Amino acid sequence: MAGPRNVRTLHGNGGRNNDVMGPKEFWLNIPPITRTLFTLAIVMTIVGRLNLINPWYFIYVWNLTFKKVQIWRLLTSCVMLSSRAMPALMELYSIYDRSSQLERGHFGPGLSNRRGPMVTVDYAYYLCFCILAITTATTIIYGSYYPVVLTSGFISCITYTWSIDNANVQIMFYGLIPVWGKYFPLIQLFISFVFNEGDFVISLIGFTTGYLYTCLDTHTLGPIWGMISRKADPTYGISPNGKFSTPWWFTSLYARITGAHNETATFNNNFANVPSSQRETRTFSGRGQRLGTAPATLSQTSGTDSGRASGSQLRSGPSNLNQFQGRGQRVGQTNSPSDSQ
């Protein structure tokens, strides 16, 4: 007889699936940088739709960005969603999915020794490099007064980097056509060329930026050149990577922004605030002895001297412990007759 089915009803939580996350759990489960991009895209769409802020202030224009010091346009123009529902949902999903996988995998904690807030510094540096490269190329092509939305270029850039890690992973293109991950950026470029001719150049700039980062990160001419020149190494242009590392000045700046530089100071302050009776200290707890008396046993001196003993002293074995065990005497006293016998 078949077992009971998991019947879900509209009322109560008797058939609730514990694996389904609520909105709060879903939001908290997103990596921090991706969460910021995801939230910013949604907030910009809402405030723009409600006319609380003119969407013009989100668009990238070189003259306004740098001459008028409206630096936020560098970021807002990369996550500005389409005014149409379906393209906007696809763009939002692409930002969430590609960015979260890069932050967890390609630039994640498993591939570096960073911990805490600093675990995301490499991904932050990657995004800053790509955004600056995309905006620079766009300014060269379109000029300093041309307004442009860079969302398609930003998505193409992170999609290309994502495709390197998922080259042999089969995915469903728009949920219909199975394709390999390594061909996904090229298919996106083709779709942009056929249906969105206005975004094709921006998408191509993003694709080129992602490829440029790969070349710098591997010190090669990239996987496309490896395929054209028929390199014997199939990983040419892909690995080993990590050669375009985050510079020290960016790491220091990021630590100040995120507050990571205060972690050591906070630990020291917390230790200083602990009462002296609760601190774990290392003090001598053995018996004292006068100069010239027999040394204490090993168990009495191990609290201090063993911590400072060198490796050669520890390896010398018990020979160092077989010392004089007779009666002690003060310095300057003569030996008693019983001792001389």
UniProtKB/Swiss-Prot annotation:
Q: What is its main location?
A: endoplasmic reticulum
Intracellular or extracellular location(s): Endoplasmic reticulum membrane
**Which residues point to the Lumenal side?**
63-122, 192
Q: Does the keyword Nucleotidyltransferase apply?
A: no
GO molecular function: any one?
Answer: signal recognition particle binding
Keywords in UniProt for this one? Endoplasmic reticulum, Membrane, Stress response, Transmembrane, Transmembrane helix
Q: Which GO terms describe its cellular component?
A: endoplasmic reticulum; endoplasmic reticulum membrane
Q: Which Pfam families match?
A: DER1
| GO BP terms, alphabetized | endoplasmic reticulum unfolded protein response; ERAD pathway; regulation of retrograde protein transport, ER to cytosol
- Membrane topology value: Multi-pass membrane protein
Q: Where are the transmembrane segments?
A: 42-62, 123-143, 171-191, 193-213
Task: List, alphabetically, the InterPro entries matched.
Answer: DER1, Rhomboid-like_sf
In terms of superkingdom, the source organism counts as: Eukaryota
Q: Where is this region: Disordered?
A: 276-341
Coiled-coil boundaries: none
Functionally, this protein is described as follows: May be involved in the degradation process of some misfolded endoplasmic reticulum (ER) luminal proteins. Its precise role is however unclear and its inability to complement der1 mutations, suggests either that it is not involved in degradation process of misfolded proteins, or that it participates in the destruction of specific misfolded ER luminal proteins.
Q: Which family does it belong to?
A: Belongs to the derlin family.
Its name, as the record gives it, is DER1-like family member protein 1
Q: From which source organism is this entry?
A: Saccharomyces cerevisiae (strain ATCC 204508 / S288c)
Organism placement in taxonomy: Eukaryota, Fungi, Dikarya, Ascomycota, Saccharomycotina
